From Swiss-Prot:
Residues 1-66 are annotated as: Disordered. It comes from Halobacterium salinarum (strain ATCC 700922 / JCM 11081 / NRC-1) (Halobacterium halobium). The gene is rps15. This is Small ribosomal subunit protein uS15. One of its GO terms (molecular function) is structural constituent of ribosome. NCBIfam families: PRK08561.1 (NF006331).
């Protein structure tokens, strides 16, 4: 599959091994995993960071290689069930942060044409994702602008 704003192909990688159940060495209780997920979310970690922490640090010293295999739910589903989900989806928030950083850089460095183009591409991605999330995770009247992005990020 191709990338969005280039003529190159996407990067390929190895597939994860298919598994129907968690490995034998990772026998952590589902409730303990859910508690740890909510605890990490309350500390301010994003869902992807939570997955990495569970993989590396684990619960009670035992690593959890795949939360969905261990609990039957994704990290975001666990957060929704415990009312600890972030206000905005993680991918959308990351794009907003990137756009704010790029906008400030372009204002300070007006001749940086490469990053002007990068800002345009990022804003395009934000508008596409906003269309996808509008009405569900975003307000129906949401319209992207630098000011609204900065306000959202500062919250």
């Amino acid at each position: 599959m191709a990338r969005m704003h280039t003529r190159r192909r996407g990067s390929s990688g190895s597939d994860r091994p298919t598994a129907d159940e968690p490995p034998e060495w990772s026998d952590v209780d589902e409730d303990a995993i859910e508690e740890r997920v909510v605890e990490l979310a309350e500390q301010g970690h994003d869902p992807s960071q939570i997955g990495l922490k569970l993989r590396d640090e684990g619960v009670q010293g035992t690593p959890v290689p795949d939360v969905k295999l261990a609990t039957g739910k994704k990290v975001t589903e666990i957060l929704e069930a415990h009312d600890a989900e972030p206000e905005l989806p993680e991918d959308f928030r990351n794009l907003l942060e990137k756009a704010v950083r790029l906008h400030e850089h372009v204002e300070a460095n007006g001749q940086d044409h490469q990053n002007k183009r990068a800002l345009q591409n990022t804003q395009s991605k934000i508008r596409r994702l906003a269309d996808y999330y509008r009405g569900d995770k975003l307000d129906e009247e949401f319209a992207y602008s630098y000011e609204t992005a900065r306000e959202i990020i500062e919250e």
